[in-house]
Curated annotation (Swiss-Prot):
GO CC annotations, alphabetized: bacterial nucleoid; cytosol
Disordered: annotated segments: 88-109
InterPro entries in UniProt: YbaB-like_sf, YbaB/EbfC
Keywords linked to the UniProt accession: Cytoplasm, DNA-binding
Organism: Shewanella piezotolerans (strain WP3 / JCM 13877)
Name of the protein in its database record: Nucleoid-associated protein swp_1717
Molecular function as annotated in GO: DNA binding
Principal location listed in the UniProt entry: cytoplasm
Pfam families: YbaB_DNA_bd
Subunit architecture: Homodimer.
Subcellular locations according to the entry: Cytoplasm, Nucleoid
Keyword Transmembrane: no
Length: 109
């Protein structure tokens, strides 16, 4: 079925992919992205593991109503989370060579 040495090569390739995935996951955890809301008046910096590192609020918003500020902070957090997901997807595509996984299947296995 696999031919001479085919299974060994397959296992070696699987191990190499697993090693690459571990490195990419470390890179993702260290990366930081910034999400914005209100045309940049509120910025949230988030790590690849979805930890919020920094919230930057333009001083002009501190004079406005509290509810609007809360909405902008939530929107900036959501934007940062979306950017993290996009970066994770791009990084994993580099490792998998764009291989499409079945829905619900997560890497690493």
């Amino acid at each position: 079925m696999f031919g001479k040495g085919g299974m060994g090569n397959l296992m070696k390739q699987a191990q190499q992919m697993q090693d690459k995935m571990a490195k990419v996951q470390e890179e993702i955890a260290r990366m930081e992205v910034t999400g914005e809301a209100g045309a940049g008046l509120v910025k949230v910096t988030m790590t690849g593991s979805h930890s919020v590192r920094k919230v930057d609020i333009d001083a002009s918003l501190l004079e406005d109503d509290k509810e609007m500020l809360e909405d902008l902070i939530a929107a900036a957090c959501n934007d940062a989370a979306r950017r993290v997901e996009e970066n994770q997807k791009d990084k994993m595509a580099e490792v998998t060579g764009g291989m499409q996984l079945p829905p619900g299947m997560k890497m690493p296995f």
